[in-house]
Amino acid sequence: AYFGEWADDLREKRDGLLGKVLVAPVVTGADGKALKASAEGADFVEFPASGKGDVRLSQPIQFKETLMQYGAKAGRSDTEGKLDLELVPAAAGSNTFVLHFKGKPLAKTEVTVFGPPKWEKRFHSDENGRIEITTPWPGQYVLEAAHVVEEAGQTDGKAYTKIRYVSTLTFNVTK
């Protein structure tokens, strides 16, 4: 797992922001079982996954008065959402997705697609939460969506006034 800004070729370092935000990630394999880190480098954490299917990571991060609920998924074979906010393919390997928030389609939400060669395009989910993207080049694609809920609460003794859910989906295209 790498953390950073794909479009800017930025990978956060363990002795910088990555070390501050990646405190206790929950990583699950396709079977839903938790994975433990097997290796760490200056800018990554490795989680061994066996078998086929998507791997998910979730990590809450509090920034001032906002609780960030970060979720990431690698792969587009699972057609059922498991994260609070998740782009779910309509069929395994499909370029049509439904943006789910807590199990229900999320309409009229911006989804940004990043792809080679540093290409970026914004889409909006329709009234049924669906988007259809194009993947014109071979290589890695990253999709990102966010949703804010005005909901106050506390975590680890710190108050927040809203929750910002951020979800990324990463997959590779071969042609």
Feature names for model-found ranges:
Residues 48-63, 140-149:
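Short, aromatic- and glycine-rich surface loops/edge beta-strands on solvent-exposed regions
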Residues 37-53:
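A surface-exposed beta-strand-loop module
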Residues 41-46, 125-139:
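Glycine-centered loop-to-beta-strand initiation motif
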Residues 64-95, 104, 117, 159-175:
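Beta-strand-rich domain onsets/edges
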Residues 3-40:
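N-terminal, post-signal-peptide region of Sec/Tat-exported proteins
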Residues 22-33, 110-122:
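Short amphipathic beta-strand segments in non-cytosolic proteins
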Residues 1-9, 88-101:
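Beta-strand-rich structural segments
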Residues 35-39, 121-126:
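Short beta-strand segments within Ig-like beta-sandwich modules, predominantly Fibronectin type-III
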